[in-house]
Amino acid sequence: MSAKYTILEELIRPVVEGLGFEFWGMEYLSLGKDSVLRIYIETDAEKGIDVEDCARVSRQVSSILDVEDPITGEYNLEVSSPGLDRPLFSLAQYQAYIGSIVSLRLRVPFDGRRKFKGQLMGIESEDIVIRVDQEEYLLPIDLIDKANVVPQF
């Protein structure tokens, strides 16, 4: 995890949790002038996350970020639920989705490839076990750039 990510999480997590939501995770994409800070929030409530929830979190987070100013330049702030194809950020989230189909993109190639799609079989220490075409891979979580649950209908 980068230092910028850690600083942003330390500012944002308490705001999200203070509003009664779970901080699911975030993505910071620095794309030159068009940077994006995407925050995912979750709730235990049956109604789920709605637009008003996202707007409320967005206003509060925006206020904190305006004061603390951890991001240089302009950026777009997006707040949403993780959705059906939810991204996975923590070991606890991976643990909760063992048995599910996941799509992974690695920072650097592992065994000659950067993309994996298969069944999440488990966690061993700091590694993710994924089965792709009857072959199991043990991937260090630090190598994972992006991970999403693949919805099954």
Curated annotation (Swiss-Prot):
PANTHER family (UniProt xref): RIBOSOME MATURATION FACTOR RIMP (PTHR33867:SF1)
GO cellular component: cytosol
InterPro entries given in the database record: Ribosome_maturation_RimP, RimP_C, RimP_C_sf, RimP_N, RimP_N_sf
Pfam family, one: DUF150_C
Protein name, entry field: Ribosome maturation factor RimP
Organism per entry: Marinomonas sp. (strain MWYL1)
Family: Belongs to the RimP family.
SUPFAM superfamilies: YhbC-like, C-terminal domain, YhbC-like, N-terminal domain
Keyword Cytoplasm: yes
HAMAP family: RimP (MF_01077)
Compartmental location: Cytoplasm
Keyword Metal-binding: no
Keywords noted in UniProt: Cytoplasm, Ribosome biogenesis
UniProt cross-references to CDD domains, sorted A to Z: YlxS_C
Role: Required for maturation of 30S ribosomal subunits.
Biological process, per Gene Ontology: ribosomal small subunit assembly; translation
